Structure formats: C-alpha cells, structure tokens
C-alpha cells in the first residue's frame, strides 16, 4: 500500500486564485480564467500567474441601451475591420410597423369594397353583410355608383365609424335622409335608385311603369290588400305626388314621401265654407239627437204622469200613437223573470181570444180614450185578455180609476158578450187568417167588469 503520509515528493499545492477571479466566475459566465506560464522559466521554479479577462463587461447601472459603441465591442472580441451596425430610424421604421385594419377582404372583381361584377348580367352589384346575412343593395352600371351605394348602406347600418370607399363628407346630404328611415326602407330607396331593379320600376316610391306606357301610382300593403291602385299618370313626378298625397292621408305627418311634405300642406287644410257646412251638419245631427231624446223622455214619462198624481200632465197629452214600440220583445225578455214572479202571486185566469199580442200600457189606453172614440183608435180593434192583467203592477190597477184626484172618462156600457157560436166563428176566422189553430176559452162575462177592463171592438 502506498504511504501517503511519508510521501518523499510532495508536490507543491497551487496558489489560491484571487478573490476577484472567484467572484467574477460566480457572477457571470462570460469571465474566464487563463493560466500563463513563461517559457524561459525552469520547471521547478516556475510561477503560475492567473489572469482573468472579461469578454462582455456588465451593463452600466442606470444607463439604457448598449454601454459602449460598436467599435468597443469589436475591441473586446479583438475583431479587426468589423463595421459597426446601423440602427433603422426615421419614417422607414414607422412604415415597417403596419396597423391592423378592421376591414375585411376586398372584392376580388372590384377595387371597391362591397362591389362585385357579374359577367352574366354585366352589372356591378353591391351587397352588405348585416346580422350574418347578405343584403342586396342593387345593380349599377358602374363600379363607382355601386361603391357609393355600399357606403351609404354602411353608414346607415354601422354608423359614421364604418369602413367606406370614399370620404364621409361626400354623404352629408344623405345623413339627413337616413335619420328618417329604417334600415329596410333605406335599402328599398337604394334599390330603386339602381339600374338592376325589376322592369318598369321608378326611382320614386310607389311608382311603376305600366305596360300601356304610363306611370302607375299605388300603395302597397294597405288594409290587408296587396296594393291600392291610385291611377295612371303621364309622368313619374305626377304619379309620385299622387302617392305622396295618399300616404299623407293614410299616415299623417309621419308618412314617407318622395318630395317635401310641406308642399302638400295647403291641400289638406279644409276651406272656411266646408267648415261652415260641417258645422251646420253637426248642428242638424245634434238637434236630431236632442229631439229623439226628448221624445224618449216623453214616452218614458207617460207612466209617471199617470201614476204620479201630478194632475195637469195626464190630461194634456192628446197625441195618438201611429204604431206601437217595435222593441217590446227585447223589453219583455229583460223583465221575464220579474213578471213571472209577480204573476205567481195572482190567480191565473184563462185568457180570452187575443187577436194581437202587442203590449198595452195605461198611457196607450189613455191615448186611445182621449181620441174621442173610446172604442176605436185609428181604426184599430183590440181585444184585451185576462192574461194581460198579470203584467201590470197592482198599484196601477188599483189607482187607474182615480189618479191624482182626477176622474177618468168611462166608456159607454159595453155590448153584451157574444154567444158561443159567434165566438167560435170569430176564432175560426182569426185562426184562418193567422194560420194558428183556433182556441176558445169560456169564462164569466162579469169578470172583465169587476177588474175594470172593457173590450174594444169596431162599431158596426
């Protein structure tokens, strides 16, 4: 085994490195330690010299950019004849950095945005995308006209910040028109101005070239119809004005017209004479309604005059009605339940032969009696049945003989009741004329007199 402690030749340990070399090696990887040994020295007495060289010195604190110029860097690397690099400055640098545009790809067949040339039709057509759908704006003869149509639609759809082909100042006049129209209406305006609109179209709203050579004015989608025909005219302007008048009449001041609505202001103001006639017509209507209401009040107040006990009102009404009220069925239907309850409290009597089923009220009876002939009213013969008595209130039946201290004129003594044979003949004749089966009811002749009813018959 080797004796390491008693080694005869102990090699001298190399001297430690300088602290600067240790620090530089730990701090940066660009530093290197180089050992230089002179050639003329003896092997035994040779001194080892360690030199540290920094190839890339650290940056100066607080300074920006390179710490030394380009020739100093060449000196570090000991490179001869290396030219210093030149930094790119000036407008060329700004041009190199391009701004990302919001615009999409341009048309492949046109230099304008939103314009495409179709060889089949030979026209330049304009389109715009809205909500994921392509909206057709029309076909034009030139690409410039199609581009202007696209610009107007883009401003309407996306505002003044939209990407357009020309300057925004060129469309200042169109901005006013855009504010009054919706998207759909503005698209229709652009299509009418295009040359690719269907045959017979016009640049005016509601105007179409008829096959006879004249211009037809019409309104579309009015009152559920497809269109309303307004007439044929010699020129487009006349047809457009006819459409404007019709639109103003239907939609008022908010109507969309071809020309300025102010030029039609004088046509829709009614003249003074027409206003006077309308006032007289309204006066006649008001008088007619007041007369009708007065008549209704008089008819409705007849019962009050008879039963109220006022005195003079009942005797002053000398009018003879020409016909009974025609709405008696409606009035009777409304009070059917009340009359049924009232009739249930009175004994039911078999009715006498009734020729007519018209309603009869005390005021009508008074009118018949006041005509002078108690048995006849305008040549009309009536037979009052017992069934009618149940429809009158009891207070009217009791107070009919003396209302308000006045005595009613009593008709002359009624003729004796007809015999059974005469009644049967009358019933048969009445049934034959009215197409109803005959019905004869017999009862005591004194019952009518006890209840205050008298038969009205035509005198022979």
UniProtKB/Swiss-Prot annotation:
DNA-binding region in chain numbering: 111-167, 203-260
Compositional bias ranges of the Low complexity kind: 1-12, 19-36, 87-98, 420-429
One annotated Gene Ontology cellular component of this protein: nucleus
Induction per the UniProt record: Target of miR172 microRNA mediated cleavage, particularly during floral organ development. Induced by SH5 in spikelets abscission zones (AZ). Triggered by cold stress.
PROSITE patterns named in the record: AP2_ERF
Region (Disordered): 1-39, 87-111, 284-319, 398-429
SMART domains: AP2
UniProt motif EAR: location: 283-287
Any Pfam family matching the protein: AP2
Keywords, alphabetical: DNA-binding, Nucleus, Repeat, Transcription, Transcription regulation
Disruption-associated phenotype: Several spikelet and inflorescence developmental defects, including altered florets palea and lemma structures, abnormal numbers, size, appearance, and identities of floral organs, reduced primary branches number, and longer and fewer grains associated with a loss of grain shattering. Crook-neck-like rachilla between the sterile lemmas and the rudimentary glumes in place of the spikelet abscission zone (AZ).
Chain ranges for the short sequence motif Nuclear localization signal as given in the UniProt record: 99-108
InterPro entries linked to this entry: AP2/ERF_dom, AP2/ERF_dom_sf, DNA-bd_dom_sf
Compositionally skewed regions (Pro residues) per UniProt: 409-419
Gene Ontology process terms (BP): regulation of floral organ abscission; regulation of flower development; regulation of seed development; response to cold; seed abscission
Tissues and organs where the protein is expressed, per its UniProt entry: Expressed in seedlings, leaves, stems, nodes, sheaths, panicles and young spikelets. Accumulates in the spikelet abscission zone (AZ) via a positive regulation by the transcription factors SH4 and SH5.
GO molecular function annotations of the record: DNA-binding transcription factor activity; transcription cis-regulatory region binding
Family: Belongs to the AP2/ERF transcription factor family. AP2 subfamily.
Assembly mode: May form homodimer.
UniProt-recorded name of the protein: APETALA2-like protein 5
UniProt lineage: Eukaryota, Viridiplantae, Streptophyta, Embryophyta, Tracheophyta
């Amino acid at each position: 085994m080797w004796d390491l402690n008693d080694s005869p030749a102990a090699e001298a340990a190399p001297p430690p490195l300088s602290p600067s070399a240790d620090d530089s090696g730990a701090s940066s990887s660009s530093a290197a330690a180089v050992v230089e040994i002179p050639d003329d020295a003896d092997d035994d007495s040779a001194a080892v010299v360690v030199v540290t060289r920094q190839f890339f010195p650290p940056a100066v604190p607080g300074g920006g950019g390179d710490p030394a110029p380009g020739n100093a860097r060449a000196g570090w690397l000991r490179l001869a004849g290396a030219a210093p690099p030149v930094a790119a400055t000036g407008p060329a640098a700004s041009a190199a950095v391009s701004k990302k545009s919001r615009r999409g790809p341009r048309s492949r067949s046109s230099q304008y945005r939103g314009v495409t040339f179709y060889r089949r039709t030979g026209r330049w057509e304009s389109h715009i995308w809205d909500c994921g759908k392509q909206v057709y704006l029309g076909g034009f003869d030139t690409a410039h006209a199609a581009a202007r149509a696209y610009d107007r639609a883009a401003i309407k759809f996306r505002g003044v910040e939209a990407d357009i082909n020309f300057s925004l100042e060129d469309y200042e006049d169109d901005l006013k028109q855009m504010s009054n129209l919706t998207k759909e209406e503005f698209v229709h305006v652009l299509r009418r101005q295009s040359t690719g609109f269907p045959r017979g179209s016009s640049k005016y709203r509601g105007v179409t070239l008829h096959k006879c050579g004249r211009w037809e004015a019409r309104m579309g989608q009015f009152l559920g119809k497809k269109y309303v025909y307004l007439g044929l005219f010699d020129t487009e302007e006349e047809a457009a004005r006819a459409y404007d008048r019709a639109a103003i009449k239907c939609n008022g001041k908010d109507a969309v017209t071809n020309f300025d609505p102010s030029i039609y202001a004088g046509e829709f103001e009614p003249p003074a004479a027409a206003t006077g006639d309308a006032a007289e017509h309204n006066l006649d209507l008001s008088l007619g309604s007041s007369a009708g209401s007065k008549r209704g009040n008089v008819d409705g107040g007849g019962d009050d005059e008879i039963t109220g006990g006022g005195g003079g009102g009942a005797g002053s009404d000398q009018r003879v009605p020409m016909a009974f009220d025609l709405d008696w069925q409606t009035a009777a239907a409304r009070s059917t339940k009340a009359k049924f309850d009232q009739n249930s409290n009175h004994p039911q009597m078999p009715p006498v032969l009734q020729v007519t089923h018209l309603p009869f009220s005390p005021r009508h009876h008074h009118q018949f009696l006041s005509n002078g002939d108690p048995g006849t009213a305008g040549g009309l013969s009536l037979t009052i049945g017992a069934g009618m008595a149940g429809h009158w209130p009891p207070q009217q039946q009791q107070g009919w003989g003396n209302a308000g201290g006045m005595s009613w004129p009593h008709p002359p003594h009624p003729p004796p009741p007809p015999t059974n044979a005469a009644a049967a003949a009358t019933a048969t004749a009445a049934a034959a004329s009215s197409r109803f089966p005959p019905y004869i009811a017999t009862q005591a002749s004194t019952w009518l007199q006890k209840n205050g009813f008298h038969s009205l018959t035509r005198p022979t």
